[in-house]
């Protein structure tokens, strides 16, 4: 299998990846989330094999879809095994606001996309997945079984990355590089939107917490202080209030 190197950003985020995968419950959630992503991707690629007019791509898409569904089973089985073996304890802090790093189809409508666009997207997604799974494989040194799952899946991801690029160059020889860059830009934009939405939710939670525990208590204290100054019981109404009004003002 070709050696896949870490990127500069991934090297800087290595402690974050170790923190995420160092907790058994977070590890289980990540594996089960990967299983869902792989299964969704497999179904979409299977649909692509049904609608493509290219017989070679039909066979390759079908093999790709079978691989993705098998990956889903591997992730699901490993997650279930860790789930059964974990000790019972409180749920830790979720890392769901961090970028997931998975490689789903991102709600791509397979029926509406030509083979060139789908191949470009799959190439970019599989390349990103291969790099990210390499990171995950390297940070789970303490879990040989999970590491073996990533090793097995990585071999398929490298093949998927290579065949999609080769076929893209075949079906679109003049514009395949442009299509790859367009797919990469679209993927980065969608990731930015996901991160921005997650970050906005996190900031909103922090601001509401600050408002509840820091801003509101002084107002509650002043309200209680004003309440203590009020005399208990009914408040008498002056007699001049009983006279009939002479005008509406």
Where are the predicted features?
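Juxtamembrane, membrane-proximal amphipathic segments and lipid-exposed surfaces
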Residues: 228-249
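Non-heme di-metal
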Residues: 1-231
């Amino acid at each position: 299998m070709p050696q896949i190197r870490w990127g500069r950003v991934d090297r800087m985020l290595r402690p974050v990846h170790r923190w995420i995968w160092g907790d058994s419950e977070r590890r289980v959630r990540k594996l089960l989330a990967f299983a869902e992503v792989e299964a969704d991707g497999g179904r979409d690629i299977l649909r692509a094999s049904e609608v493509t007019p290219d017989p070679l791509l039909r066979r390759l898409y079908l093999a790709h879809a079978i691989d993705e569904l098998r990956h889903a089973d591997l992730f699901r089985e490993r997650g279930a095994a860790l789930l059964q073996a974990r000790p019972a304890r409180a749920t830790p802090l979720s890392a769901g606001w961090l970028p997931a790093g998975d490689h789903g189809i991102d709600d791509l409508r397979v029926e509406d996309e030509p083979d060139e666009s789908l191949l470009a997207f799959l190439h970019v997604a599989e390349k990103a997945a291969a790099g990210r799974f390499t990171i995950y494989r390297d940070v789970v040194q303490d879990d040989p079984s999970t590491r073996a799952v990533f090793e097995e899946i990585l071999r398929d991801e490298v093949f998927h990355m290579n065949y999609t690029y080769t076929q893209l160059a075949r079906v679109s020889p003049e514009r395949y590089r442009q299509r790859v860059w367009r797919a990469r830009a679209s993927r980065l934009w969608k990731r930015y939107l996901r991160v921005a939405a997650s970050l906005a939710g996190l900031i909103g939670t922090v601001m509401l917490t600050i408002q509840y525990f820091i801003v509101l208590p002084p107002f509650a204290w002043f309200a209680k202080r004003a309440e203590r100054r009020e005399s208990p019981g009914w408040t008498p109404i002056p007699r001049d209030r009983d006279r009939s009004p002479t005008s509406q003002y």
